[in-house]
Amino acid sequence: MVEENNLEKGISAIIPTYKGEAFISKLLDSLISQSIDPHLFEAIFIVNGELDSTPDIIKKYQEENPQINIILTYSEPGVCNARNAGIDIANRQYTIFIDDDDYISYNYFEKLYQYAKPNRIVIGTFLDVNENTGEIQESYLSKPLLESSGINTNPYPD
């Protein structure tokens, strides 16, 4: 585990993956298109469980995009094991978790980093999209739920 005073500026994105070959490229594309300086984030992919071609896809992106710090490692099966393995090697000030079937907006890291401060939790928005129809579905964390919890759901404009 990296000591807190040895952390670099920026964001460590911890991304557990299990048989993600069908959708990992979309996430990788969204990572390489980030508007933030690529030196301010690292993407830590943790393969947990059975192997498919996901590690090969990640390695290809590593080779084609050397400006992005992409780390590939392996853990015991299970998303919790993978996240813990990622936390152990993360070396940035802030840590986020991204699922392997997600993709993020081009300014996701920039906005998170802009609003991140010590002892503050920054929560980004998300949408559930039906891949077959493109229909946006109700999210599990609905705006009314967040608002009733006292969480500011939109502290900055798009």
Regions from the language model: what does each represent?
Residues 39-50, 71-75:
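Short beta-strand/loop segment that forms part of the nucleotide-sugar
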Residues 47-56, 99:
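A conserved acidic beta->alpha catalytic loop
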